[in-house]
A protein has these predicted regions:
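Conserved catalytic-core motifs characterized by acidic clusters
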Residues: 53-60
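Terminal amphipathic alpha-helical/low-complexity segments used for targeting or macromolecular assembly
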Residues: 1-9, 127-139
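Hydrophobic alpha-helical transmembrane segments of membrane transport and translocation systems
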Residues: 116-123, 128-130
Length: 139
C-alpha cells in the first residue's frame, strides 16, 4: 500500500510512522515521513517536507526500535521545503518556516526559520491554514 500511495501522490509515509487525527498535507509532492516519526493531531505539512532520521544505516539491525525521526506535537505547521531531522520534538502550536532545517528541539509556541533554524517569533496567536473561525474579526 505504501509504494502504491507514493506512486499516486508523491508522498512517502513509512508504514510504522505514527500519525494523529486531522493530518493535513497540502500539495504533498515530495513529502517524506520516516519510520519512527510521530505526528500529533491537527498538524499541517506543506510540500517537499522531510521528517528524516540522521543516524547512518551502517548496521540497520542495530537501529531497530531506536527513535531516529522527529516528533511533531499537536497543532504544528511545517512550511514547504522544511527539513526536520533527527529524534527531536517540535512542541505544540509551533510554526516552522519554509526551507528551514531543524535539528534541535523546538519549544511550545515558537516560530522558527532559517538554516539552521532559529527562533524568529512567537506563535502564540496560532495559524489556521485556510480557516476563518470568526475569531479574526476586528473588535
Amino acid at each position: 500500500i505504501s509504494q502504491f500511495s507514493r506512486f499516486l501522490t508523491g508522498i512517502e509515509i513509512h508504514p510504522k510512522a505514527k500519525i494523529g487525527k486531522n493530518l493535513f498535507i497540502d500539495h504533498g509532492m515530495g513529502v517524506v515521513i520516516g519510520e519512527t516519526s510521530e505526528i500529533g493531531d491537527n498538524v499541517t505539512i506543506y510540500h517537499n517536507v522531510t521528517l528524516g532520521g540522521i543516524s547512518p544505516s551502517i548496521n540497520s539491525n542495530e537501529q531497530r526500535d531506536i527513535k531516529r525521526h522527529p516528533t511533531l506535537e499537536d497543532n504544528v505547521v511545517i512550511g514547504s521545503g522544511a527539513q526536520i531531522l533527527g529524534p527531536i520534538t517540535i512542541a505544540k502550536n509551533s510554526l516552522i518556516g519554509s526551507n528551514s532545517v531543524v535539528t534541535k528541539n523546538v519549544s511550545e509556541k515558537s516560530g522558527m526559520a532559517g538554516s539552521p533554524a532559529k527562533k524568529v517569533g512567537d506563535a502564540s496567536k496560532g495559524f489556521k491554514p485556510y480557516a476563518v473561525t470568526g475569531e479574526e474579526k476586528e473588535q
